[in-house]
Amino acid sequence: VIITSKSYSNGCNAGYTSLAKDLDEQIRLYPSLTHVFSAGNDGNSNCGYGAGAGWGNVTGGHKQAKNVIAVANLTQISNLAGSSSRGPAADGRIKPDVGAKGTSVNSTLPNNTYDSFTGTSMACPGVAGCMAQLYQAYKELNGNVNPPSDLMKCVVLNSADDLGNPGPDFKHGWGEINVLKGLSILENNQYQSGSITQGSDEDHILNIPAGTKEINIMVYWHDKEASTNASIALVNDLDISLTSPSGSVTLPWVLDPTPNSSILNTPATQGVDDLNNMEQITIKNPTPGTYILTVNGTAVPYGPQQYFMTYEIQSSEITLTYPIGGEGLVPGEFELIRWDATDDSYPFVLEYTIDNGINWNIINNNVGVNSTFYNWNVPNSLNGVPVATDAARVRITRNGITDESDANFTIIDVPNVSVNWICPDSIYVIWSSVTGATDYEVSMLGQKYMDSMTTVVSNGNTTQSALLLNPNPNILDSWFSVCAKKNDGKGRRDVAVNAQPNNSSCAAPPVANFIVNDPISCSGEVSFQDDSYGQPSNWLWNFGDGNTSNLENPLHSYLSLRPV
C-alpha cells in the first residue's frame, strides 16, 4: 500500500497527538507512502482554538500531522462548503492542505443503488485518486519506480488552484487540487531535490522565460516527528528566499495564526515561516531572466534534511480542460465547461460547433476575466433542427489567444433501456429510439466493464430491440445498457438495468427425437413419428436415401431396407 484514504475523526483540534507522531514517522520511514485524510465536517464548531466558532476545528490530531494531506470540501464550482473544517492546526500551521469536490457527490449504496453525499469524506478519496494518477504518471516517466511521497505532496500543493484569499489560507489550504498542472510539473521536470544541514545554504537556479504571467515555487520536506503534544510540531526548520535578476529578494507566504477571527481571515503576507514544513513564493509578471532560490537550514537538529523544490510557470495561454473530445453530452442538460488560465484583464469568449468547425456559434462573448468555468446549456436544437452530432467541439478565446477541444465529442440523447426477457440461451433487450441516432450499442456487464455485445442499426421506429445469445447462461443476474451513436460518436449510456433469468417463461431448447413404426407393407413404406420436445415448430427429416420431408409425422417408402 502506498496511498491510503481515511475519513475517521479523533477529537476536534486535538493537537499533535501520538497518532500524528506515528504517522509522521511512518511516512518518513516509508519514502513512497502517502496518507490522505478528510479535514472534517465541523466548520461551524468551536473546538477551543481561541478564535470562536469557525476556526481551528480540524477533526483529529492525525489530520494535523505534518507529512499527511488533509482535504477540505469544495462545491462543484470551487466554493468552500460551510461544514468543511478549518485551520489552523493547534500550533498555528496551515491546515487543511488542499481542497476537492466533496459536495453532492454520487456514491454507491447497498442493493445496487446510488445516492448523493456531502462532506470531506467525499473529497478525501477524490484527492487520493488524483494522487494515484500522479503516481502512475511518475512511474511511466521514471522506469516504473514509485515516486518519493515528499515530491508528490510538493507537486500537489504547488500546482493547486488558488482559492479564497491570495496565497494559502486557513480555509482552503493551498487551493483546489489540479492534476493537469501537477502532471505538467512532472512531465517537464520542473522539480529538483536537495539535502541540507544546520546553518548551510543551497542554491537552485531557475530561468524564467519572457511572457510569464506568474511563477509559483515551493519547497517541501517530510519533517521528523515531534514529541507527543508538542506545542510547536516543526522540528527541522528550513527557510527560502528568491533573488531576482535585479537583486531584489522575495520571501515566502506566511499567515498569522493569532487566535482572532479577523486576523485568521487576513490574507497571507510575505515573510519568514517558522511553523510549516512547506514554503511557497509567488511572483506575478516576473522579469524574465535567471533567478536564484536559496534554501537555508535555519534549524536542522536532525539532519541532513532532504527536501524537494517544484516550480510552476504560468503564461498567458488558455488550456481548455472540458470537454476535450470523446465525451457524450446530452441535449438540454447543463455541463460545466472548464479551463485553466492565469488572471488577465480581458474577458473570455466561448463558442461551440456541431459541424467540425465549419460554423461556430456563440455561447457567451463576455465571460468574467477570472473565471475558469461556465455552466453551458447543451443545445437541444440549432436553427429549429434537433441537435444530434458526432462533430461537436468547444472553443475559448481571450485577447487573440485561443484553445479548443482536442477532438470532437458527441451530442445525442440517451435511450431508455429495459430487458424483455433473459433465458439460458438468449436475451431480448428493448429501448426507446433517439432522434438522429444512426445506430445503437448494446452492452452487458463483463468481469470488469460494460462490454459491447452488438451494434444495431436504427430502424426508424419508436422502439428498437436486440436478440442476443446469452454468453453466461449460469449467471444468476446480469446488467445491460444501451447508448445511441451518431456515426462513430457514442452518446452517454443509459443507467444499466439488472435482469434475472425467469426460466418459467423461457422455452426449453428443442431436442430432436423420433419413433419408427414397423413397415406398413412389403413395399417398404415406413411410418415415422416425431418424439421431440421443447415445443418444436418446424421439422426437417432426412431419410438417408437422398429424400427429405417437412411433415411432423411423415410416411416414407424405401426401395430397399437400409439403416436410417
Give the positions of each predicted feature.
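Substrate-binding/access-modulating region of protease and related hydrolase catalytic domains
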Residues: 1-66, 90-93, 107-126, 224
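Hydrolase catalytic cores
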Residues: 99-166, 293
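Beta-strand-rich modules
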Residues: 468-491
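Extracellular/lumenal mature domains of secreted and surface-exposed proteins
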Residues: 502-564
